[in-house]
């Protein structure tokens, strides 16, 4: 038989697999011993052999003679055994975990206005205040004594275990001025002067990003005081002259009325602006907490100039809390709560502190302001750092907050800054805005603008080491930025984020305000110790579960199936990466087994079975009839027996969990799934390219995520009524968006390879069919836009679907996210052996954290 060369050559493609239902080019009648007329069909193939011979009575009963080939699975039993660590959960670990949980719960419950460390700089300013009774003594002698007792061995004041030249120089200058004013501590003053002389010349070597807030305002002003007091300091150093020039330039740019028009960050540094401040006007900007922007030093300066009783009340309030010293700012109640919640969530230990997190967020929400929030509830100057953190966390926990709050921090050029009217921004605040921007709802253009702006800034920051950081000195802020850019919200699975943040988290991180300060309820060893113990404990349970599932796979005979992908470990990694808590072990097992069947049956319907056999398989599921297995070929017998036995067991366990029969429910879920598979097989048989809408209607089901979720949901620990099931059912928008986004990300990364293997229908190809005037690149871009919009809508469904139990919502939403991770760079399931997914599986399941 001869085939026209143009017909044959136009159909031959390279590839590793053979199309499921062939495009037939010709046939040759052949007799059989049974006397039936059969035909030999030739078709183009997709494996090493480009022309495939098939025999059958008609095209739709033709079994392939060349098996579809997939890359072999990496995670074989011997590989898993070789990676099994010696770690086991010891009773002492369990006891320590319980102790840490109790201690951290107490930490949350004791949160008041914020815990922080002493500021020698601010304490020196408070110690300056003369007694209000007219005696020639300090109003707060305990603060003066603190200065005398807390000079460091090198003659400086500040944090003993952290050295930043700017911070030490500033604190030391403030302390020697105060001691000189009170004519005490001559020895300490002299040692402080010697320190200043030796270090001031080296300060130029310090990164500009380490310069405290307002340094160029307060430092020159204090130097002027020191000179008037006769302190022998190196006033002519080039560095000092440069700082003085910066101060003068900044003051010249300052509009005369801005200082009094509305609260700004200038209120934080009034002690450095005393010669220009109108004290009567400035009193109108005093905060509700009686301070000036929560700054003890600024408030002390105002009190010494005005005698305002409210200022004195604020200082008494702070000293009542801290005793003989003051911090660099106080209160810090919103900042402390938000960052503590963020910390335990990123470390993956938040499941131990649900009530404490709710209490903390209720507190923050009760002080939420549509204009933004600052670090304290009565802080009149909002900042983008606290606001973005609050917007993201509150939204994800179901609080009603609007993204319009970010407009406060955007200038006319569309750039985002930390404080209103300023150009200051740092890596940490832009990172928090970026993280916030990914929890957008549909139509929130401000979130898209924030995403683009911050991504640009952060990518540039990675190339510029000087950009790290304006507001914080963190252990590995670069690592945090790299993770956030590579794994944004819709790709960031909880276990992967926990693993990454355990490595990046600094239990001794410090922040930069006017001086360096620490937040022990945000950065501490207890969080990190619990995170490591809990991660390794959970991972140990996961490895045991994976071994059980591997035994199920092997005992069911699935390892004998040559036509399908063996991806048991990768599939188990999916639920383990997000529904990781020990109490969801059964749910993870059901999720994994169901997912494995979706892969087996997808490969069966897509590339292996004839239409007749596929219809028989579907009918067997519909009738739930094991007797029909006798009519199936051997490999399909293995499939159906395993399917039948597994879901009978799952249904029985589901009956116990739900208190009612769930087998018919599971059957119906699978009937819908197999109908979608069958339709795709029928399309492929005749090389039919549907319209985009027709394709998506079926493909959002055939992606099989809904089947996995709808069956697994029965094991989330909740009694699911018909009403609840309907809210995540096939007709729900929530489930549809999960399937849609999963299908689109799959198609965008696989359509070219599958087209080379003979597949004719994908979101991109179907969209091009509807719009023949556009290019493939334009169609792909449009599909990405549809997916991005759907992800925004999925965010909204996840946040607002509060009638659905939390674990069910997580199940739907996280299943959508795991698809974004698997297909971020290609087909992460089929090609998982040589992709980053392999490392994720290893880190999540086999490699304990040290």
Curated annotation (Swiss-Prot):
It catalyses: (2E,6E,10E)-geranylgeranyl diphosphate = (+)-copalyl diphosphate; (+)-copalyl diphosphate = abieta-7,13-diene + diphosphate; (+)-copalyl diphosphate = abieta-8(14),12-diene + diphosphate; (+)-copalyl diphosphate = neoabietadiene + diphosphate. Substrate binds at residues 250, 470. Its main location: plastid. A motif (DDXXD motif) lies at residues 602-606. One of its GO terms (molecular function) is magnesium ion binding. Pathway: Terpene metabolism; oleoresin biosynthesis. Its cofactor is Mg(2+). Its EC number is 4.2.3.32, 4.2.3.18, 4.2.3.132, 5.5.1.12. A motif (DXDD motif) lies at residues 383-386. Binds 3 Mg(2+) ions per subunit. SUPFAM superfamilies: Terpenoid cyclases/Protein prenyltransferases, Terpenoid synthases. The Asp-Xaa-Asp-Asp (DXDD) motif is important for the catalytic activity in the class II active site relevant for the cyclization of GGPP. The Asp-Asp-Xaa-Xaa-Asp/Glu (DDXXD/E) motif is important for the catalytic activity in the class I active site, presumably through binding to Mg(2+). This is Bifunctional levopimaradiene synthase, chloroplastic. It comes from Pinus contorta (Shore pine). The lineage of its organism: Eukaryota, Viridiplantae, Streptophyta, Embryophyta, Tracheophyta.
């Amino acid at each position: 038989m001869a085939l026209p060369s143009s017909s044959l050559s136009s159909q031959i493609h390279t590839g590793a697999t053979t199309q499921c239902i062939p495009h037939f080019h010709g046939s040759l009648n052949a007799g059989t011993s049974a006397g039936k007329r059969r035909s030999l069909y030739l078709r183009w193939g997709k494996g090493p052999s480009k022309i495939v011979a098939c025999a059958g009575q008609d095209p739709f009963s033709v079994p392939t003679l060349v098996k579809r080939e997939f890359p072999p699975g990496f995670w074989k039993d011997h590989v898993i055994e070789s990676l099994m660590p010696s770690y086991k959960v010891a009773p002492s670990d369990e006891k320590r975990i319980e102790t840490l949980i109790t201690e951290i719960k107490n930490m949350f419950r004791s949160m008041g206005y914020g815990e922080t460390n002493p500021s020698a700089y601010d304490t020196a300013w408070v110690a300056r205040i003369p007694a209000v009774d007219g005696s020639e003594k300090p109003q707060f002698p305990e603060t003066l004594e603190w200065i005398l007792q807390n000079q460091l061995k090198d003659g400086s004041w500040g944090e003993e275990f952290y050295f930043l030249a700017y911070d030490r120089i500033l604190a030391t200058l403030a302390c020697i001025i105060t001691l000189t004013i009170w004519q005490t501590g001559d020895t300490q003053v002299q040692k402080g002067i010697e320190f200043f002389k030796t270090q001031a010349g080296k300060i130029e070597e310090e990164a500009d990003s380490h310069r405290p807030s307002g340094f160029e305002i307060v430092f020159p002003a204090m130097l002027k005081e020191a000179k008037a007091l006769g302190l022998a300091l190196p006033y002519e150093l080039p560095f000092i002259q440069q700082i003085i020039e910066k101060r003068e330039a900044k003051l010249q740019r300052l509009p005369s009325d801005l200082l009094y028009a509305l609260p700004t960050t200038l209120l934080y540094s009034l002690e450095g602006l005393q010669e220009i401040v109108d004290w009567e006007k400035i009193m109108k900007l005093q905060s509700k907490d009686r301070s000036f922007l929560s700054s003890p030093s600024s408030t002390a300066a105002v009190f010494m100039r005005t005698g305002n009783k409210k200022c004195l009340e604020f200082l008494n309030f702070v000293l009542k809390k801290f005793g003989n010293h003051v911090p660099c700012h106080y209160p810090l109640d919103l900042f402390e709560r938000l960052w503590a919640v963020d910390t335990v969530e990123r470390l993956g230990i938040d499941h131990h502190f649900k009530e404490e997190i709710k209490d903390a967020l209720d507190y923050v929400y009760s002080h939420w302001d549509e204009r933004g929030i600052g670090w304290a509830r009565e802080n009149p100057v909002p900042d983008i750092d606290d606001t973005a953190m609050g917007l993201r966390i509150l939204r994800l926990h179901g609080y009603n907050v609007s993204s319009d709050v970010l407009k406060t921090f955007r200038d006319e050029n569309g750039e985002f800054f930390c404080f209103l009217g300023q150009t200051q921004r740092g890596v940490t605040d832009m990172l928090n805005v970026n993280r916030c921007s990914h929890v957008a709802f549909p139509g929130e253009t401000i979130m898209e603008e924030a995403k683009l702006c911050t991504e640009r800034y952060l990518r540039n920051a990675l190339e510029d080491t000087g950009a790290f950081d304006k507001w914080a000195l963190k252990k590995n802020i670069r690592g945090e930025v790299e993770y956030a850019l590579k794994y944004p919200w819709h790709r960031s699975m909880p276990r992967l984020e926990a693993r990454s943040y355990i490595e990046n988290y600094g239990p001794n991180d410090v922040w930069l305000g006017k001086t360096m300060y620490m937040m022990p309820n945000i950065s501490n060893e207890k969080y990190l110790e619990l995170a490591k113990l809990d991660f390794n404990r959970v991972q140990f349970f996961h490895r045991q579960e994976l071994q059980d599932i591997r035994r199920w796979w092997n005992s069911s005979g699935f390892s004998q199936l040559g036509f399908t992908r063996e991806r048991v470990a990768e599939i188990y990694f999916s639920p383990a990466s997000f529904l990781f808590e020990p109490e969801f072990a059964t749910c993870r097992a059901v999720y994994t087994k169901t997912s494995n069947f979706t892969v087996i049956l997808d490969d069966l319907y897509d590339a292996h079975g004839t239409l007749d056999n596929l219809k028989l398989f579907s009918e067997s599921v519909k009738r739930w009839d094991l007797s029909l297995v006798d009519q199936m070929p051997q490999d399909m017998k293995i499939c159906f027996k395993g399917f039948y036995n597994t879901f009978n067991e799952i249904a029985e366990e589901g009956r116990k969990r739900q208190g009612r029969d769930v087998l018919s429910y599971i059957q119906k879920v699978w009937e819908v799934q197999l109908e979608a598979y069958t339709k795709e097989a029928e399309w492929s048989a005749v090389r039919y390219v549907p319209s985009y809408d027709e394709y998506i209607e079926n493909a959002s089901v055939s992606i099989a995520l809904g089947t996995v979720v709808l069956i697994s949901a029965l094991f989330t620990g909740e009694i699911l009524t018909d009403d609840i099931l309907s809210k995540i059912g096939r007709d729900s928008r929530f489930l549809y968006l999960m399937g849609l986004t999963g299908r689109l990300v799959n198609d965008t990364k696989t359509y070219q390879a599958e087209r080379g293997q003979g597949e004719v229908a994908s979101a991109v190809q179907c969209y091009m069919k509807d719009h023949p005037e556009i290019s493939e690149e334009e169609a792909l871009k449009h599909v990405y836009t549809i997916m991005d919009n759907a992800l925004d809508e999925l965010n909204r469904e996840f946040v607002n679907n509060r009638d659905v139990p939390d674990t069910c919502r997580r199940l739907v939403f996280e299943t959508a996210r795991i698809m974004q991770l698997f297909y971020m760079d290609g087909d992460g399931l089929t090609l998982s052996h040589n992709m980053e997914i392999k490392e994720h599986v290893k880190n999540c399941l086999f490699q304990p954290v040290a």
